[in-house]
């Protein structure tokens, strides 16, 4: 899939579930549960045991799922993830060399940033979308709206503090998509609960887009 198509898919679905798990098997079960709810995008964090293997398995067995590598802190890790099937790369922080590595492979990169200076620096370095993290620590949707006022040209995906209760507020504030963690994909939850959560979030995004 071309880079532009990946970004278009991320924006269309409007959600990036942040997958954390205690084992590769649990991660694969959660990934299937998310997809069953209609959300065919997910971010496999490097904190998952055997994360690279999980990405490889998903790439081989679930071509319907858009696979992202999360919590990527350096270019070497980014390269490993890309070679094993990651179609976009996400980080909680800004590493210019990681951005450059993703450019080398023509892969969308979503580095983390929080302050206006960090966000602009990430954008100028070539970030396709900036992950505003942790959004909740700075006031949530109100903070995102404040950022978007002077920086409408920078696409942002808030992560941290996104919930069913706040999702619409973040979309109203101008979010490119929503990064959602345990509120959607709690590793302790039953798969059917995760599927129901995915459906719930997808309904919120679709309802918002229909009214916009």
Q: Predicted segment positions?
A:
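Glycine-rich phosphate-binding active-site loops on the catalytic face of alpha/beta enzymes
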Residues: 88-101, 131-140, 173-197
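Conserved N-terminal beta1-alpha1 strand-loop-helix module at the mouth
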Residues: 1-85, 104, 156, 164-165, ...
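Catalytic alpha/beta core domains of metabolic enzymes, predominantly
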Residues: 110-131, 155, 159, 163, ...
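Short secondary-structure boundary segments
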Residues: 46, 71, 92-94, 113-115, ...
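Short acidic active-site motifs
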Residues: 5, 54, 76-77, 97-98, ...
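Helix-adjacent hinge/juxtasegments
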Residues: 68-69, 74-116, 120
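Conserved beta-strand positions in the central sheet of alpha/beta enzyme cores
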Residues: 18, 43, 68, 90, ...
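Glycine/Thr-rich beta-alpha phosphate-binding loop at enzyme active sites
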Residues: 39-44, 82-87, 103-105, 115-144, ...
């Amino acid at each position: 899939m071309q880079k532009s198509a990946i970004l278009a898919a991320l924006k269309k679905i409007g959600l990036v579930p942040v997958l954390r798990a205690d084992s590769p098997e649990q991660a694969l079960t959660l990934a299937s549960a998310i997809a069953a709810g209609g959300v065919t995008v997910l971010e496999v964090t490097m904190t998952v045991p055997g994360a690279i293997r999980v990405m490889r398995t998903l790439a081989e067995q679930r071509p319907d799922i858009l696979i992202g590598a999360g919590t990527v802190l350096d270019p070497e890790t980014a390269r490993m993830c890309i070679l094993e099937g990651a179609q976009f790369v996400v980080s909680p922080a800004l590493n210019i060399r990681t951005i450059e590595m993703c450019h080398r492979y023509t892969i969308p990169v979503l580095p983390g940033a929080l302050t206006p200076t960090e966000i602009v620096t990430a954008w100028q370095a070539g970030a396709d979308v900036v992950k505003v993290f942790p959004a909740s620590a700075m006031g949530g949707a109100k903070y995102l709206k404040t950022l978007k006022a002077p920086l409408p040209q920078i696409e942002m995906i808030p992560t941290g503090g996104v919930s069913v209760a706040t999702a619409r507020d973040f979309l109203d504030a101008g979010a490119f998509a929503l990064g959602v963690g345990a509120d959607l994909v709690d590793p302790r939850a039953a798969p059917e609960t995760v599927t129901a959560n995915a459906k719930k979030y997808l309904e919120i995004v679709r309802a918002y887009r229909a009214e916009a």
